[in-house]
Amino acid sequence: MHDESEKRETSLKLFSTKEAYSSILDKSFSVPTAEGRILDHGFTKEEIPYIYMLPFKILKEPKLIMFQVKIIHNILPTQSSLFRARITDTDVCPLCNLESQSLKHMLITCSVSSSFWIFFSNWWHEKFNQKQTLSESTISYGWHKESNNWEVLNYSLIVAKYNVFATSVPNGVLDFDSFLLRLNNKIDFLCTIAFRSNRLSEFKKTWAKLL
């Protein structure tokens, strides 16, 4: 009886968050409206599981994982949703102070956010000598084409989106330097994890151009 209990405990420890989410997807518990929006952005049904699994595959921090999951399912709090819930007095975007702040507005169509993504594209070209088109689908759901820098690009995009979100919450000023500082802190965190798991050489190979 004791051995059986230990086996069950070990089995539970090995059942990761990633596997749990995969199990949910296998049982078709995904939000239908999320799937519809993904298809509207030009992805195929076969690509949808990759979009759902992206944050679990490349991220280590639970906060960032849940952040991207909320974007996928369009449940990330915005001024618009908070206003509808009567939590805030206005739905106006704190970044541009011009329009209602939906998720799409906050991350993509806001004039301040649009300028931020131009800086991101220029920075990426400078670091990797690659011209990266940041379409609405790429910003929202990630880059899913084969690329040597696939992991770095998607990780950087999620941190960049989080920086936009975090800046808009306290009515702050969105600047690119704050993103770079946040990204460098995250890279240091990933480096520590890689060192502790004896995968430092692999980490340095992946992130070489940003170290």
What is each PLM-predicted segment?
Residues 36-211:
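Family-specific functional microsites
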Residues 1-37, 206-210:
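Short linear motifs embedded in intrinsically disordered, charge-biased segments
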